[in-house]
Amino acid sequence: MFIDNHDVERVASILEDKNQLPLIYTMLFTMPGIPCIYYGSEWGMEGTKNWNDTDLRPEIKVFEWNELTDTIQKLIHLKHNHSALSYGDYTQIGITNTACIYQRQDEKECLWICMNMKNEAQTLGFNGQGNFIDMETNEELCIHNTLEFKPYEVRILKRSSD
């Protein structure tokens, strides 16, 4: 699975709001399939398609480690260490224009991927109750059908009993 390549405009050039880039990469690494990243996109490189595609395939001389690169590194680590993200079943819990919640589950664990794709805070309906662990912060959360999200926030949650 990929979000851009040498034949299409880079995703960073398409998005009006670059704060959505981490959300796209979260989907890439947590949905079924093998994630592929076109060189330079891990840094948020832009490029538009033209008659000879030179903007899509520039020479990269300087490595630009940034916040997006950090996010992708964490997602690679998460996918490598949680079999549900590679082999688990996918269940869509709720998808709207501004939010997305889905589940990845195998025989070992059940992960809930939750995203606020909006530039303002919102409360998302959460079709689940109980104790969960936030995979990024290790914070234990007691959830009762709703969850508060900051703008563009992503949470990957695991039931604490798994």
PLM regions: where:
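Alpha-amylase-like alpha-glycosidases and glucanotransferases acting on alpha-linked glucans and related
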Residues: 1-34, 43, 50, 85, ...
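Carbohydrate-interacting/catalytic domains
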Residues: 32, 37, 41-162
